[in-house]
Amino acid sequence: SLTFTSGNWNVAQTVTVTGVDDAVVDGSIAYTIVTAAAASVDPGYNGVNPADVSVSNTDNDAAGITVNPTSGLVTTEAGGTAQFTVVLTSQPTANVSIALSSSDLTEGTVAPASLTFTSGNWNVAQTVTVTGVNDFLDDGDIAYTIVTAAAASADPIYNGPNPADVSVSNTDNDVAGITVNPTSGLVTTEAGGPAQFTVVLTSQPTANVSIALSSSDLTEGTEAPSSLTFTSGNWNVAQTVTVT
C-alpha cells in the first residue's frame, strides 16, 4: 500500500512489480496490478479509484524431456548394470508417461518399464537401470538400444514428444571351447573293464557341432559312441564317452 500526506502528496512513490516463475509452459501471461479506491478522511480523496496497471509476464519455460547420458553405457553378460536418468524441463498440467523397452532382450533388460511424471515430481530425475543378459554365445560385445517411447499425456504440450534413446554395449563373457575331463589317468582292463570321460562345450553354438572319436589302437581299447553331437539346446550338457 501507499500513503500520501500533506507533506509528500506531490512526491511520486515507486511501485515495483516482479515476475514469478510458474514452471509451466504457458506463454506470456497478462495480469493486472489493481489499485484500490483511496481511503481518507479528506472527502475529496476518499473513494477516488486510480487506474489499474496492465502487466505481461514473459514466459521462460520450455517443454522438454532430458535423458542423461544417451550413450556410452556398458552392461556385462555377468549381469553388470548401467543407469541413466530422465527428467522434464517444465511442469506439466497433467501426468506424463514414458514407456521404456530394450531393442534386444537377449543382450539387456530395462527397469522400470515406464516412468510417470506429475506436476509434483516433474523436476526430480528418475533413474532407469539397464541389466546385461548372458546369451551364452561367443559373439563379442553387442550394441543395443533402450528405446524411450513418445510421451503420453493429457497435457497437449507433453503429449507426443519423443525423448532420446539410449545406446548401450553388452560386454561378452563367453569363449568358444571344448572341455574334456579327464584327459589322463584312465585305466581299462583286458577283462573288459571300462573307463569314462566327458565332453562339453563352453559356449552355445549357432549350429550343430560334431566331434568324431577313435582309438589309436583298436587291439587295446575301443570307444563308444564314435561321435558326439552338440546343439544349441544341449551344448552345456556333458556327454559321456566310454572306453572299453
Language-model segments: residues:
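Intrinsic disorder/low-complexity segments enriched in polar/small residues
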Residues: 14, 78, 84, 92, ...
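A generic structural motif
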Residues: 62, 91-93, 105, 175, ...
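Contiguous beta-strand segments of beta-sheet-rich domains
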Residues: 12-41, 47-49, 55, 86, ...
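Short, solvent-exposed loop/linker segments at beta-strand-coil boundaries, enriched for Pro/Gly
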Residues: 1, 102-112, 215-227
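Beta-sheet-dominated interaction scaffolds and their linkers
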Residues: 2-8, 54-85, 89, 112-119, ...
